[in-house]
Amino acid sequence: MKVLAIIGSPKKGNSYRITQQVENRLKSYAKHDSIGKVDLEFDYLFLKDANLELCKGCFACIPRGENKCPLKDSRADIEKRILASDGIILVSPVYSMNVSWLMKNFMDRFAYTLHRPIFVNQKLMLIVTAGEVGLKETLKSLSYTMGGSDLVSKLAVKTPPFKYRPKYEESIARDVDKASQKFYKSLKSDKPLPPTFLNVLWFQAFKAISEKTKHHFPADYEFYKDKNYFFYETKVNPLKTFAAKFMIRLFLRGFDKNFYTK
């Protein structure tokens, strides 16, 4: 199994240190797995060193497709690295109650995956560190990326610039263990979780809107036109589909009152 940690810090500080601890835990679990030694490859992508230019906000990737982005850098190569991985760890320190600018730019450059989820085979773990406050807010912000991925584990660690007492070091170790075990367990399962109602609602909403706005958002229309029930082949509870479509019909009534889409 392959794990890619995407580091959004401009330096190798607390966020990197905690990620290294997770790496060590995962490799230990793989080495001593009950089924025998598991081959686990752990790699890093440091956004500070990546050739990922600042998003221009041109909106080209959303309606027309990511291949229409005017920036010629390593975005497509990064996408390939993510798709080739079984697990992704997004890592960011808390800056001004949110993710770092490096991570925010990464999120902006891959915003098209929220319209067209492609990371359906990837398990996702989030790691955030902060001196004291902003952990909850940053985790929430970081969760709105990597469209299609299965968010299975979150780790938030307070890392103030003081020497830690032994008991606090132990509490960090316990949190790292718990989050790492949860992530490792999910990596061993190649079966995606059954779609929740919110997942189905998300799919049906984008499919319905893509059909109504196909001239404005051709990339979305092409992505959804051959998909009937979900982003990938899986069993979907018909009651969830019925309820989602009913809610979307109600939503579209208001949509049509406010916007011209033809």
Whereabouts are the PLM-identified features?
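"Short basic amphipathic alpha-helical interaction patches in structured regions
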Residues: 103-107, 140-143
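P-loop/Walker A phosphate-binding loop and immediately adjacent motor/lid segment at beta-alpha junctions
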Residues: 45, 105-123, 129-130
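Short, glycine-/small-residue-rich phosphate/pyrophosphate-handling segment
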Residues: 119-158
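Conserved anion/nucleotide-ligand pocket segment
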Residues: 149, 153-185
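Compact, basic/aliphatic-enriched, mixed alpha/beta core segments that act as assembly/interaction modules
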Residues: 137-140, 144, 148, 182, ...
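N-terminal beta1-alpha1-beta2 submodule of the flavodoxin-like/Rossmannoid cofactor-binding fold
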Residues: 1-91, 97-105, 111-112, 152, ...
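Short histidine/acidic/glycine/proline-rich micro-motifs that form metal-
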Residues: 9-13, 96, 129-133, 160-163
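A short secondary-structure junction signal
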Residues: 101, 135-140, 167-168
